[in-house]
A protein has these predicted regions:
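Active-site glycine-centered loops adjacent to acidic/histidine catalytic or metal-binding residues
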Residues: 3, 28, 50, 112, ...
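AMP-binding/adenylate-forming catalytic core of the ANL superfamily
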Residues: 82, 87-88, 104-106, 111-203, ...
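Conserved ATP/PPi-binding loop(s) of AMP-dependent carboxylate-activating enzymes
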Residues: 51-55, 66-100, 137-139
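Short Gly/Pro-enriched turn/cap motifs at secondary-structure boundaries
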Residues: 47-52, 104-105
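Gly/Ser/Thr-rich phosphate-binding loop
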Residues: 1-45, 57, 67
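Short proline/glycine- and acidic-rich turn/helix-capping motifs at secondary-structure junctions
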Residues: 207-219
């Protein structure tokens, strides 16, 4: 249960430790007490975060401009309403609270991108702040990381384990995509790997920065704030 996609390495480790067991991935945030959705043991769909809990309402809407519902299967911003949603941050002005009015209801704006199947099952697509708009298209930085980690080894920030990530992707203020890596990878090699993965030409690394190590937080996750600062 968490606010990030469960890494494939966790599924593999669970299958080895508990043969025949069922791993029920779910999703939640502190502001929603914290569970929003979860896979049921009798109907697990690996790679998804399941369906909303009873009494929890969700809406998947356009990430920019006035909210509008997106079609089933399309990626959009996740809104949540229900008795589990908190009342707001203490000491924060009302106009800075993470709520939005939509279809006559006040919703909590999660900042997360998901897609919703026709049966209501949700799939986590990433944090909005980990996307960059290029040529009018929302480009997933984690998707670029995943492709490059698979192509060059060393693991991404989610899969790296104790040795730390070998690469990470961030964008500068100008939207340029930067690959930070401890490996010897050229920009041409990185972009060739993205093309081989059949990603559109908008998924392109503008430059590569070699580092002795990728900065990480105390949680072991990549410190993207530090990387973004170095993009400036």
């Amino acid at each position: 249960m968490g606010a990030e996609k469960c890494p494939d390495s966790v599924y593999a480790a669970f299958a080895e430790a508990a043969p025949g067991g069922v791993l029920c991935e779910g999703y939640g945030v502190t502001e929603c007490s914290p569970v929003i959705s979860v896979n049921r043991p009798e109907s697990v769909l690996p790679g998804t975060i399941g369906q909303p809990l009873p009494s929890v309402r969700v809406a998947v809407v356009s990430a920019e401009g006035e909210p509008r519902r997106v079609a089933p299967g399309e990626t959009g911003m996740l809104l949540v309403s229900g008795p589990n949603v908190f009342g707001g941050y203490l000491g924060v002005d009302a106009d800075k609270q993470p709520f939005v009015a939509f279809e006559g209801t006040e919703w909590y704006r999660t900042g997360d991108l998901v897609s919703e199947a026709a049966d209501g099952c949700l799939t986590f697509r990433g944090r909005l702040k980990r996307f960059v708009k290029v040529g009018g298209e929302m480009i997933s930085l984690p998707q670029i990381e995943s492709v490059l980690a698979a192509a060059f080894g060393g693991g991404s920030s989610e899969e790296s384990g104790e040795q730390g990530p070998a690469l990470a992707v961030e964008s500068g203020e100008d939207g340029a995509i930067v690959l930070f890596t401890t490996l010897d990878i050229t920009r041409e090699e990185a972009n060739a790997a993205l093309r081989a993965a059949r990603l559109s030409g908008l998924f392109a690394v503008a430059r590569v920065q070699k580092l002795a190590s990728i900065p990480v937080l105390g949680t072991g996750k990549t410190d993207y704030k530090a990387l973004k600062a170095s993009c400036a």
